[in-house]
């Protein structure tokens, strides 16, 4: 008979992409014992393929940008069938999340006056994408992994959930 090792967690997060890592970090910060399961090696999630950047109305390149304009662009881009509240929350929270990543060690491209550089992307009225060259997803995963591991999140790699 095979023997199995058992673990006891308050929260088990399945998937170690950007969303799974961020959920694990949030739960751990609340004092909850977290286990994170990924089917491959940590850092191999699809988030690393994201090249363009993170849409956030930081107003670093054009000071006319704000969360309401970002929200309107998001709704228009989704032909108004998006979940209204989720689009609104994203537009409101995105600048805080970008600064959070930066405080955790993410290294974004910079303007001449050392603000986070933003570039144009389809459907956005103003330059809004905070980026790290064409490796934004890789930098985001690296930052979230490092922060999560330093918080003591237990990571189980190469596991299958059935």
For each predicted feature, which ranges?
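Short coil/turn connectors at secondary-structure junctions
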Residues: 7-9, 30-33, 51, 151-153
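Extreme N-terminal leader/targeting segments of oxidoreductases
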Residues: 1-11, 29-30, 132
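Conserved N-terminal/central alpha/beta ligand/cofactor-binding core
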Residues: 39-162
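N-terminal Rossmann-like FAD-binding beta1-loop-alpha1 element of flavoenzymes
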Residues: 11-36
């Amino acid at each position: 008979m095979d023997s199995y090792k058992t673990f006891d967690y308050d929260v088990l997060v399945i998937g170690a992409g950007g969303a799974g890592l961020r959920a694990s970090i949030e739960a751990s910060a609340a004092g909850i014992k977290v286990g994170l399961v990924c089917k491959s090696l940590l850092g191999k999630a699809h988030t690393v393929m994201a090249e363009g950047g993170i849409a956030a109305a930081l107003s670093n390149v054009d000071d006319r940008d704000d969360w309401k304009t970002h929200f309107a662009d998001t709704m228009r881009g989704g032909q108004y069938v998006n979940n209204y509240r989720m689009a609104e929350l994203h537009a409101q929270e995105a600048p805080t999340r970008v600064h959070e990543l930066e405080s955790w060690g993410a290294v974004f491209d910079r303007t001449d006056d050392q603000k986070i550089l933003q570039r144009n992307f389809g459907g956005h009225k103003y330059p809004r994408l905070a980026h790290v060259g064409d490796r934004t997803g890789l930098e985001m995963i690296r930052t979230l992994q490092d922060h999560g591991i330093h918080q003591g999140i237990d990571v189980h790699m190469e596991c299958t959930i059935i």
